[in-house]
């Protein structure tokens, strides 16, 4: 998703100048089983046994909707969203006898959708039309007041990045999936960066004091590490010593995993009936 947005913004032929971020209200809770079964019966009418299986699984939901965290539920919601995304891309306007798409490009992650185009008015029109169609077809509503971004040109971003005052160097960007994406660089979302920085600073003090980090922090360090490698955060990574601390965290996780497997294989574990990965002894 992040890389796709970067490619769209850097392709001059698309002429993208604006972006709007949309979010579906209570997406999984409002996606009903009847809507999903209607789509599946339309797409695969001959797969009767598969339809019965999916319907039986959906009936296990207490409210008759999708459940957050379910593997099948995630794919079924993506199926519903594919119809919404294709409808957005199909919206057009006619100017001087030629058809022009309102949405030039879009990306989606779960219930977050980012639409990009040449005019902000086109994006607003597409959002209103798609919201009405989605509510009528699937019973899903978009949250009002989505974020709107006006991207700067590559030259303007380079000029701002070399200003004297650090506070004036910022550029507007699209905030999606934990990243803030511009044309020439990408940063981490402020709230995520604050939590990641806090964990690496604490880990640095623990490494200086005892030479290792506790297991619970090792998991956090490993999960936050990708935000630094996938963004323009080289100087910050050097300051936080991520390249030194992250391998140490992986060693701690590996040691804990081997200990768990050893206890499990020696039948000293009360959860022995399950797989080693599900063992909760440590």
Where are these regions (language model features)?
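Conserved polymerase palm-domain catalytic core
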Residues: 3-110, 114-135, 171
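Right-hand nucleic-acid polymerase module
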Residues: 9, 22, 86, 93-97, ...
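Arginine/glycine-rich "motif VI" loop of SF2 helicases in the C-terminal RecA-like domain
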Residues: 139
């Amino acid at each position: 998703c992040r890389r796709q947005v970067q490619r769209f913004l850097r392709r001059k032929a698309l002429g993208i100048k604006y972006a709007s971020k949309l979010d579906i209200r209570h997406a999984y809770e409002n996606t009903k089983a009847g809507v999903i079964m209607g789509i599946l019966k339309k797409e695969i009418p001959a797969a009767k046994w598969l339809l019965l299986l999916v319907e039986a699984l959906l009936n296990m939901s207490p409210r008759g909707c999708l459940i957050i965290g379910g593997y099948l539920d995630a794919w079924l919601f993506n199926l519903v969203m594919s119809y919404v995304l294709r409808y957005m891309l199909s919206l057009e306007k006619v100017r001087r006898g030629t058809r022009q798409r309102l949405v030039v490009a879009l990306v989606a992650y779960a219930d977050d959708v980012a639409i990009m185009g040449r005019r902000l008015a086109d994006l607003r029109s597409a959002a209103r039309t798609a919201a009405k169609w989605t509510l009528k077809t699937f019973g899903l509503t978009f949250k009002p007041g989505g974020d709107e971004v006006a991207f700067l040109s590559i030259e303007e971003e380079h000029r701002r990045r070399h200003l004297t005052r650090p506070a004036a160097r910022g550029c507007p960007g699209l905030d999606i999936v934990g990243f803030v994406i511009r044309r020439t660089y990408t940063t981490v979302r402020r709230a995520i960066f604050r939590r990641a920085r806090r964990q690496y600073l604490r880990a640095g003090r623990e490494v200086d004091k005892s030479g290792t980090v506790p297991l619970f922090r090792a998991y956090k360090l490993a999960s936050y590490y990708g935000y630094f490698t996938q963004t323009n955060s080289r100087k910050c990574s050097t300051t936080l010593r991520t390249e030194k601390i992250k391998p140490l965290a992986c060693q701690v996780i590996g040691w804990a995993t081997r200990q768990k497997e050893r206890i499990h294989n020696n039948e000293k574990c009360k959860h022995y009936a399950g797989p080693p990965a599900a063992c909760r002894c440590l």
